[in-house]
Amino acid sequence: MSKVSNGGGDSKNTLYCSFCGKSQHEVRKLIAGPTVFICDECVELCMDIIREENKSSMVKSREGVPTPQEIMAVLDDYVIGQKDAKRVLSVAVHNHYKRLAHQSKNSDIELAKSNILLVGPTGCGKTYLAQTLARIIDVPFIMADATTLTEAGYVGEDVENIILKLLQAADYNVERAQRGIVYIDEVDKISRKSDNPSITRDVSGEGVQQALLKIMEGTVASVPPQGGRKHPQQEFLQVDTTNILFICGGAFAGLDRIISARGEKTSIGFGATVKSVDERRIGEVFKELEPEDLLKFGLIPEFVGRLPVIATLEDLDVDALVQILTEPKNALVKQYQRLFDMENVELVFHDDALRAIANKAVERKTGARGLRSIMEKILLDTMFELPTLEGVREVVISGDVVDGSARPLYIYAERQDEKGNVSA
């Protein structure tokens, strides 16, 4: 119901939104219904909720899983660029769950699993792609760090701890866990330390690759429900990893030089044109990746063989980083604007400020991951001062603020009122 305020001697009624309680003076538009009112902000919020529900209950294909186009459409909402990688992932995930539906029909033909390897520079969106995928298809999803894994019997995490974490994410529902997704990050850090055999065991490199082979291929893992060490008297949960989709990701620093060296061998003669690594972007070089390059990098043949789908990601340029700052549903600029909105302050970024932030991230070679730290540094003083300042309505960030040659511009309510009176 609408609220009515007489405002002292004013005989005009003030109308209020029946949902959020804001007055007609606080919103752009107030829509009247039979006995209720709704503001434009609440309408927009309702539309966002409906869109999210439509995305989460996407139209299914005949096999009961999202089609590649539907998966790609949702990825586009959250991840900027990386079109080729998104297509590869969309098809791979669709086929994986189609295979699960096919198995339940007891067909004579057994469809093999296709695990995925994501190769791309730091901060290009490998981990974020995997997280977004898990959100789309609503299955248990966990992330594991390959650098913490060691062979069984050594100090560090056992590879079976990965399955335990997945089981915990599925609330100990074994059947649901067996259809989940595991993302193993920093997989390039478990490469073989050297080509020469050594008398000492490589427990965090090749040893981890060997340990991962079985669970990636498919085995029944005995997982202690409470975690920790296994005891003979303990009851174990049996988890079949055959249908768990494994996605491995890594930056593979130095792999571009291996790929370029292979290309130089094939380009010989007076007419051959060979670009050096410095002249080409890393993402461009990664597009020529072959399994033999991964072997030279230090991955063992059996491990590479269990990752048949390889998706390469491009390094992000300034334009892509500006898009990442502003366009996705949970873009960084939108996040900070929401924080400032809690103080009833509007945060505004000029276009030159966004490009300056993107340029800094490119110079640091940190990709999208470095954008937040740059934003935090720019806004730190403002976020420190703002809660104690009165009357601030707007904070404006220009390119000079990003460069450090100026302070953010504070616009106070009184000045805005003065501008309104002048224009009137």
From Swiss-Prot:
Residues at which ATP binds: P121, T122, G123, C124, G125, K126, T127, Y128
Domain of life: Bacteria
Keywords per UniProt: ATP-binding, Chaperone, Metal-binding, Nucleotide-binding, Zinc
The UniProt record lists the keyword Glycosyltransferase: no
Gene Ontology cellular-component terms listed: HslUV protease complex
One GO term (biological process): proteolysis involved in protein catabolic process
Keyword Lyase tagged: no
Molecular function terms, GO-annotated: ATP binding; ATP hydrolysis activity; ATP-dependent protein folding chaperone; protein dimerization activity; unfolded protein binding; zinc ion binding
Signal peptide: none
Entry binding sites for Zn(2+): C17, C20, C39, C42
Domain ClpX-type ZB: 5-58
Subunit and interaction comment: Component of the ClpX-ClpP complex. Forms a hexameric ring that, in the presence of ATP, binds to fourteen ClpP subunits assembled into a disk-like structure with a central cavity, resembling the structure of eukaryotic proteasomes.
Function, as annotated: ATP-dependent specificity component of the Clp protease. It directs the protease to specific substrates. Can perform chaperone functions in the absence of ClpP.
Similarity remark: Belongs to the ClpX chaperone family.
HAMAP family, per database record: ClpX (MF_00175)
NCBIfam families documented for this protein: clpX (TIGR00382), PRK05342.1 (NF003745)
Name of the protein: ATP-dependent Clp protease ATP-binding subunit ClpX
Gene from which this protein is expressed: clpX
